[in-house]
Amino acid sequence: MGDLDLLERMRRTRSGWGEDDMDRLYRSFGFREITRSRAPHRVYVHPDYPDLRATVARKNSLPKGYATTAVRLIDKLLERQKAKGGTP
């Protein structure tokens, strides 16, 4: 199971997050990084649901939209896992 504490903190506060926080969150929920070397952004995809993708800038301070996207994407993942009968 993913880092639910981090997800809940991000749900409450959308600002103040960096690329390392996003990396920890996405990886904890099973996303894999598929970034090409020297790319300006990191790209994450979930192996069971390849349409669930995220792009994260390589910055220590990210705009609020990155946290909003992360929360929405992980909520979609949890809904799909629940519908499939898996453990979120």
Predicted regions mapped to residue ranges:
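Basic nucleic-acid-binding interfaces
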Residues: 1-36, 46-88
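Positively charged interface segments
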Residues: 41-45
